[in-house]
Amino acid sequence: MKPLILASGSPRRKQLLEQMNVPFTVCKSTIDETFDPTFPPDEVVQQLARQKAQDVAKKHEDSFILAADTIVVFQGRILGKPATEQEARQMLSQLSDQSHEVLTGVALLHQGQVETFVETTEVRFWPLTDTEIETYLQTGEPFDKAGAYGIQGLGAYLVKELKGDYYNVVGLPLSRTVRALKVHGFSTRF
């Protein structure tokens, strides 16, 4: 079996794979993650995941590469990671008492062949007060996460309802990813 490389610097994706006893190493992709906002969100996440995998494969040609990209989509608009506190505040205000989608594109690459899929989860926030938003901003948690929140941390307080894969919102649709790895011969707990 070829070694598995996670093409991500995300500590959350690393923790999720470790949780499932999947043997892997990490090699962070260095691609420019800007995208054309006119593209459909599912194409954006698949393309970014594919580009990350291809970037890492240049250094690890014989390895099996796993890459992912997660975005939040609100009213047809992609919300990435906020660049400023004001942007994070605006995102959280928009998401207050509303539903949005979290999409993760996953790419599995080996010997030039790429398989991709997209997982979508619907999330609804509670109505948030300005004080709740400001308190959450002060934690620093919103700034490295798409949509300005982390469901696995203090951001769980914001979430009223979830339809779909919880782990997808964290950053990697775990069951579907591990099942895909298993199809390719990777050892898992199952």
From Swiss-Prot:
Main location (coarse class): cytoplasm
Residues at the catalytic site: D69 (proton acceptor)
UniProt site positions, description: Important for substrate specificity: R12, T70, Q152
Function (record text): Nucleoside triphosphate pyrophosphatase that hydrolyzes dTTP and UTP. May have a dual role in cell division arrest and in preventing the incorporation of modified nucleotides into cellular nucleic acids.
Family: Belongs to the Maf family. YhdE subfamily.
Entry-linked NCBIfam families: maf
Protein name (database record): dTTP/UTP pyrophosphatase
Species this chain originates from: Halalkalibacterium halodurans (strain ATCC BAA-125 / DSM 18197 / FERM 7344 / JCM 9153 / C-125) (Bacillus halodurans)
Gene, per the UniProt record: maf
